Amino acid sequence: VAALSPSLIVLSLGTNESFSTSLTRDELYKQIDTVVSSLRKDCPQAQILLTTPAECARRRVRRVNKKRRVYYTPNARVKLVREMIRSYAVEHRLACWDWYEIAGGEGSSSQWRKAGFMAYDRTHCTETGYRVQGEMLYRALMKAYQEYVDRVAQ
């Protein structure tokens, strides 16, 4: 990463971590801190933007009349991971883009799936969904930049 001399590093994490039932808050905090510290050391000129994971769902299976039925339930740990990332960002004075909230919060993975933006696994976006996410992040960055320019110009 250092060879690229980035001015901005977007660090998206939390989705996979939210599926771990053994990962503690302290362990997650240490993992985030290890990555951020390494990036700060290797790329001191870069600003770091953390993003929270969107809501996702866990796959469940039940038997109904001897047939297996698959259904999905919201992954409740996403909220915990989201809060941990947001807290870390505040404590370390990092920007944080709250993808969980922006994507629609609780219940949004079903809506994204219906719109064709969330993959069948209810965890990952489709190609179109990732394009939408990228466009939303781009707009948020450009809006924040314009607000900064306007403040500096005053």
PLM features: what roles do these ranges have?
Residues 7-12, 47-52, 95-99:
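Structural recognition of the beta-strand scaffold that forms the well-ordered cores
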Residues 27-31, 77-80:
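Short, glycine/acidic-rich beta->alpha junctions
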Residues 56-154:
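Catalytic His-Asp segment of secreted/periplasmic serine-dependent ester chemistry enzymes
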Residues 39-44, 144-147:
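Secondary-structure transition/capping motifs at alpha-helix termini
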Residues 1-29, 55-56:
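Oxyanion-hole/transition-state-stabilizing segment in secreted/luminal serine hydrolases
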Residues 32-37, 82, 86:
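Generic structural signal for well-ordered alpha-helices
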Residues 1-5, 34-42:
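Short amphipathic alpha-helices and their capping/turn segments at secondary-structure boundaries
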Residues 20-21, 47-51, 59-62, 107-108:
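Extended hydrophobic-aromatic, low-complexity segments
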